[in-house]
Amino acid sequence: MLLSIHIPKTAGVSFRRILAQLYQEDFLLKYWQMTDARGQVVSTVPLNVRCIHGHFSPESMLQAYPQAKLITWVRDPVERVISSYYHRLRDPDWQHPVTRELHEKKLSLVEFAALDLMRNEMSRYLGTRQPKDFAFIGRTECFETSLARFLQMYNFNQVPVPRENCNPQRTSAYYPVAASVRGKIAALNERDVAVYEEYCQSLTESEVVSV
């Protein structure tokens, strides 16, 4: 069993499409609800499932599946917050309280980053887990390289690389945000910055360039 932890804005939707293609009927999503490969809501995990992907903490799932292998993706914390900000402006999920507050109060990027739910979000998903606890860690900035490593590890053939939830207005690898703003966002996410650096140390040389 693979437990794929989808930290928001780390290319988790693109990776989800790939996992669904690879595992087909043996794939399950766990977000607000659990849904099987056909999109049907299920109350329990079917016995055939070999991969679960979604927004959940490692501890919550490892209690039920102690032998499962953890996999996840990490992203530069500042870029991740900026991406979340523009995504919520562009494609709002009105069920989420942060999205409602963003639009109702017309928050700036820094004001959005200062919200409690937006600070150190990556750390909250990973909990007390260390890099050694994960069978695979991908880096969003090197998505194709990380994906190739994942496919090789699990003996899958190459697959087309989808690009889901990408900002169509972003024309370069990084958002054009002032250094002073980046510094403020980094300061609001000190734990995430430390976690990101620690996790990147476990990656291959081709994936840690510019960390």
Can you describe what each PLM-predicted range is?
Residues 14, 18, 145-149, 153, ...:
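Amphipathic alpha-helical segments that form well-ordered structural scaffolds
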Residues 35-73, 78-164:
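PAPS-dependent sulfotransferase catalytic domain
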Residues 11, 76, 192:
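Short, conserved catalytic/metal-binding motifs centered on acidic residues
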Residues 5-8, 12, 63, 136-143, ...:
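Aromatic-acidic/polar surface patches that form glycan- and anion
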Residues 2-34:
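N-terminal pre-catalytic "stem/leader" segment of glycosyltransferase-like enzymes
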Residues 51-58, 159-211:
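PAPS-dependent sulfotransferase catalytic core
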Residues 1-2, 66:
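A short, charged/proline- and glycine-enriched loop
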